[in-house]
């Protein structure tokens, strides 16, 4: 598939199916839990389209699913943003668990990781432990706030709860990676 290079996107505009899968086969890809999540996602989109921020939509979505406990895995560089998000979710009635990327303060030397400043203690980002702690806390839905590229993947793979991203880190573009796509200077 090369949908990114399709000039027409008739799947969206005309109901065209460009794959080998029948509609029945596609529906079979979704378990009942998947369908429940799809219903909550569809309700979030249809009732709040162009009305809510991603943070607000995330709380709405969690309520639609009946979630009570939310986890936040965040980068130390976005600690203030994580605090704001955690407080927002608490104000919406959720129990919130949050874990910083530097949890346990394991030096990068322990895993033979490259350091920004060699010769000094530099705590590694610890996405698998972030996931383990949130798994142990029994979170039902986890959100990423600014985890590094690769660490976000490690966290997602290790999390027992479904994961979504609230804020994507981009150190150069003020955490707005889409800015590179919108700017002619990056093309």
Question: Predicted regions span which residues?
Answer:
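Electropositive, gly/pro-rich neighborhoods at or near active sites that engage anionic ligands
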Residues: 1-69, 76-80
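Short Gly/Thr/Asp-enriched flexible loops that form oxyanion-binding sites at enzyme active sites
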Residues: 81-88, 152-161
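Hydrophobic anchor at the start of a short beta-strand
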Residues: 70, 96, 163
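Active-site glycine-rich loop that binds ribose-phosphate moieties when present
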Residues: 53, 122-136, 147-149
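Long, charge-dense
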Residues: 81, 85-132
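Short, surface-exposed connector motifs at secondary-structure boundaries
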Residues: 64-71, 133-139
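Short, flexible loop segments at boundaries between secondary-structure elements
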Residues: 160-187
């Amino acid at each position: 598939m090369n949908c990114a290079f399709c000039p027409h996107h008739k799947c969206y505009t005309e109901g065209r199916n460009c794959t080998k899968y029948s509609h029945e086969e596609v529906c079979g890809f979704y378990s009942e839990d998947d369908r429940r999540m799809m219903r909550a996602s569809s309700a979030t989109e249809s009732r709040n389209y162009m009305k809510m921020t991603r943070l607000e939509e995330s709380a709405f979505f969690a309520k639609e699913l009946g979630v009570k406990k939310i986890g936040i895995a965040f980068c130390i560089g976005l600690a203030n943003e994580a605090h704001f998000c955690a407080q927002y979710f608490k104000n919406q009635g959720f129990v919130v668990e949050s874990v910083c990327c530097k949890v346990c303060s394991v030096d990068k030397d322990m895993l033979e990781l490259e350091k920004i400043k060699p010769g000094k203690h530099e705590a590694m980002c610890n996405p698998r432990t972030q996931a383990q702690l949130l798994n142990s806390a029994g979170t039902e839905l986890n959100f990423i706030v600014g985890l590094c590229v690769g660490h976000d993947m490690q966290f997602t793979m290790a999390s027992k709860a479904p994961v979504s991203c609230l804020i994507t880190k981009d150190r150069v573009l003020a955490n707005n990676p889409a800015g590179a796509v919108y700017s002619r200077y990056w093309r």
